[in-house]
């Protein structure tokens, strides 16, 4: 790093800040605790490698992060003090949040009691409302991006994927898919254009659920089920949620962005307006954590006991086909699937073998079933495969030449997982795995081209969060 060294071998940046311990690292930056030499004040310094930023094409993203942080001065948003640069490094000098990540505090408890969860949620909503009033949409809200100061107050951070009003197209919508899968709104998944404010509100709803429950509302091992649950807002509240909290969540996690609750309406709700008391007066651990051991069964029982009118209202909203639209993230500099590919909490290892043993592949697309079948037929014809259209969205391809284990036989199955979104599974049903790998690399992947939204498996991004209702795992 471009740092001066004092006689005591301390690392000093530009004669002004003494660098301390590493707090965290991202793809292109590291964050350190540091001290201002003139005053001894603790700060956090985010250090970017200029060459890596330029090589990755994320220069505009870094500039946007600076612009956003200079716009947003709020007690619940991490403050940017100054920006410095040398030939090889860029330094963001920021407010230091000594309480660490909210995620870390949550991981030490099975869940938060409702008064504690409400306190954090109130602070989050006031911060998000202020950002929106300044034309800033965060687009990656999650517990890992919520820090705590010495008093335990919440601070929103990491505006690297944020958007400004100036990024809207002529239709007044954002079109870059980004964010972290489990927290991303359905309309972002559908990738047609979305209101950044409404997408942030959905993420706030997921965060509130996590604070109250200790696990994610949408967290399935099966990609098809995951997509469907998110787009239909299919989740279950555990029995310890109050009626008012459940009603608020139903409005926050409304799959239709046009009818999803607004921030002003959130603030008007009696549940939100309840006065908070200092954290010192509240237990940070739920009084009956043992209930988590049977949370799935308890949730199912509680669902049966829900108020009929409320349940009907939720079911009606779940069936809405949205008129607006990542994961995500699809790179503006990085987008939904790219971010997903970096998420260690996502795992398709059971479905996809290592590259040398590949016998299956899966991709998502926004093309119609007819277009998908037509393209697969073209691929079969070009590769001298026979082609058979089977029932229930399945097609079969069979090679004309025998390999070491006979002719290569392939089956493709098409699943509709959301409005205008299909997932296609392609698997070897006969022949040799090396022949399938050659087919995948040389014929299938190149021929599909732009028809594919994203590949899952092998050298491409995995998509599925690991484990159903478990305590949340950290997502990058």
From Swiss-Prot:
Location of the active site: 140 (proton acceptor)
Record lineage: Eukaryota, Viridiplantae, Streptophyta, Embryophyta, Tracheophyta
Physiological role: CIPK serine-threonine protein kinases interact with CBL proteins. Binding of a CBL protein to the regulatory NAF domain of CIPK protein lead to the activation of the kinase in a calcium-dependent manner.
Keywords, in A-Z order: ATP-binding, Kinase, Manganese, Nucleotide-binding, Serine/threonine-protein kinase, Transferase
Catalytic activity: L-seryl-[protein] + ATP = O-phospho-L-seryl-[protein] + ADP + H(+); L-threonyl-[protein] + ATP = O-phospho-L-threonyl-[protein] + ADP + H(+)
Region (Disordered): 296-315
GO molecular function, one term: protein serine kinase activity
Name of this protein: CBL-interacting protein kinase 30
Protein family membership: Belongs to the protein kinase superfamily. CAMK Ser/Thr protein kinase family. SNF1 subfamily.
Region Activation loop, residue ranges: 158-187
């Amino acid at each position: 790093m471009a740092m001066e060294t004092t006689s005591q071998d301390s690392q000093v940046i530009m004669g002004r800040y003494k660098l301390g311990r590493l707090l965290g690292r991202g793809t292109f930056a590291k964050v350190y605790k540091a001290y201002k030499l003139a005053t001894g004040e603790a700060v956090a310094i985010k250090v970017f490698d200029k060459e890596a930023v330029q090589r990755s094409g994320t220069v505009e993203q870094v500039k946007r992060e600076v612009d956003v942080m200079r716009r947003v001065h709020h007690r619940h948003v991490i403050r940017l003090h100054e920006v410095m640069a040398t030939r090889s490094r860029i330094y963001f000098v920021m407010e230091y949040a000594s309480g660490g990540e909210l995620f870390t505090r949550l991981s030490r408890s099975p869940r938060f009691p409702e008064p504690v969860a409400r306190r954090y949620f109130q602070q989050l909503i006031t911060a998000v409302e202020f950002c929106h009033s300044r034309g800033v949409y965060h687009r990656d809200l999650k517990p890992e991006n919520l820090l705590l100061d010495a008093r335990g107050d919440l601070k929103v951070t990491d505006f690297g994927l944020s958007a400004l009003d100036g990024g809207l197209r002529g239709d007044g919508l954002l079109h870059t898919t980004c964010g972290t899968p489990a927290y991303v709104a359905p309309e972002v998944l559908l990738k047609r254009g979305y209101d950044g404010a409404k997408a942030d509100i959905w993420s706030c709803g997921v965060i509130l659920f996590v604070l109250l429950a200790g696990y994610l509302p949408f967290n399935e091992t099966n990609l098809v089920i995951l997509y469907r649950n998110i787009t239909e807002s299919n989740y279950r509240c555990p029995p310890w949620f109050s009626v008012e909290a459940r009603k608020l969540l139903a409005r926050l996690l409304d799959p239709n962005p046009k009818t999803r609750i607004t921030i002003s309406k959130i603030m008007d709700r009696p549940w939100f307006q309840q006065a908070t008391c200092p954290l010192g007066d509240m237990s940070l651990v739920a009084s009956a954590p043992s209930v988590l051991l049977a949370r799935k069964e308890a949730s199912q029982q509680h669902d049966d006991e829900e108020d009929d009118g409320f349940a009907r209202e939720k079911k009606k909203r779940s069936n809405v086909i949205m008129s607006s639209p990542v994961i995500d993230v699809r790179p503006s500099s990085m987008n939904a699937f790219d971010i997903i590919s970096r998420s260690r909490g996502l795992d398709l290892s059971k479905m996809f073998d290592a590259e040398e043993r590949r016998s299956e592949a899966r991709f998502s697309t926004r093309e119609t079933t007819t277009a998908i079948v037509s393209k697969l037929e073209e691929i079969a014809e070009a590769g001298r495969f026979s082609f058979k259209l089977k029932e229930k969205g399945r097609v079969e391809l069979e090679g004309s030449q025998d390999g070491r284990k006979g002719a290569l036989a392939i089956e493709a199955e098409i699943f509709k997982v959301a409005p205008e979104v299909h997932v296609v599974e392609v698997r070897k049903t006969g022949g040799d795995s090396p022949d399938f790998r050659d087919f995948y690399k040389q014929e299938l992947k190149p021929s599909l081209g732009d028809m594919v939204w994203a590949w899952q498996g092998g050298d491409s991004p995995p998509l599925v969060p690991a484990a159903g209702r478990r305590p949340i795992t950290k997502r990058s």
